[in-house]
C-alpha cells in the first residue's frame, strides 16, 4: 500500500493542472487501486480534490461530474520539494524560466481560494472541463459569488490566451470572469 500511495502522489504531481487520469498513475496499478490511493491522500488532507462542474448555475456542487477531477497538493512547498525545485532559484529567475510555473500558480491560487471560503462550507473547489469532438476546454476554478458562477483562469505570467474562459462565459451567459497570474 505504501508504494501505491507514493505512485499516486507522484502521479498527482505530474498531472497537476489537468484532469486526473487514474490509469496514468502507474502501469502496475489497476483503476481501483489508483482511485483508492488518491482517496487515502485526500482523506489525509495531503491533496485537495477539485471537482468538475458543468457551471449551469449555483450551487456548483449540485452540478458535478464525478468522473472528472483534478488534484493539487496541500502546500506549494511540498510541490517544490517533490519537483526538486529550489525556492532561491524560483525567486531569482523569471517565471518563464520554469516549466512548472503554471502548475505552481494553479496550486497557489487554489489553496488561497479554498482558504477564502466561508467557514460553514466544506471548502470544495470546482473547475469546468469540456470535451467535445476535436475540442477540449478548461477553466481552472469556479466560485459562487453574489449568487452567480464566477470563473477564474490562472496563468503563470502576463501572456496567454483566455479562449476557454471566454468560451465558458459565452456558452453559459456569465457576465464576469477573472484572469489571474
Predicted regions span which residues?
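A cross-kingdom feature that marks ATP-driven nucleic-acid transaction machinery
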Residues: 39-181
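Conserved helicase/translocase motor-coupling segment
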Residues: 1-43
Amino acid at each position: 500500500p505504501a508504494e501505491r500511495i507514493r505512485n499516486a502522489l507522484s502521479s498527482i504531481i505530474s498531472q497537476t493542472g489537468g484532469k486526473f487520469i487514474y490509469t496514468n498513475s502507474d502501469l502496475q496499478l489497476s483503476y481501483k487501486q489508483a482511485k483508492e490511493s488518491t482517496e487515502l491522500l485526500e482523506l489525509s488532507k495531503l491533496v485537495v480534490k477539485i471537482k468538475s462542474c458543468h457551471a449551469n448555475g449555483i450551487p456548483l456542487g449540485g452540478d458535478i461530474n464525478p468522473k472528472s477531477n483534478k488534484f493539487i497538493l496541500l502546500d506549494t512547498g511540498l510541490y517544490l520539494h517533490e519537483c526538486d525545485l529550489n525556492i532561491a532559484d524560483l525567486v531569482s529567475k523569471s517565471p518563464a524560466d520554469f516549466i512548472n510555473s503554471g502548475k505552481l500558480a494553479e496550486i497557489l491560487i487554489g489553496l488561497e481560494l479554498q482558504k477564502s471560503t466561508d467557514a460553514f462550507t466544506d471548502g470544495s473547489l470546482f473547475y469546468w472541463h469540456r470535451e467535445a469532438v476535436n475540442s477540449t476546454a478548461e477553466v481552472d476554478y469556479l466560485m459562487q459569488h453574489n449568487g452567480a458562477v464566477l470563473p477564474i483562469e490562472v496563468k503563470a505570467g502576463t501572456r496567454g490566451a483566455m479562449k476557454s474562459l471566454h468560451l465558458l462565459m459565452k456558452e453559459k451567459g456569465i457576465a464576469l470572469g477573472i484572469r489571474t497570474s
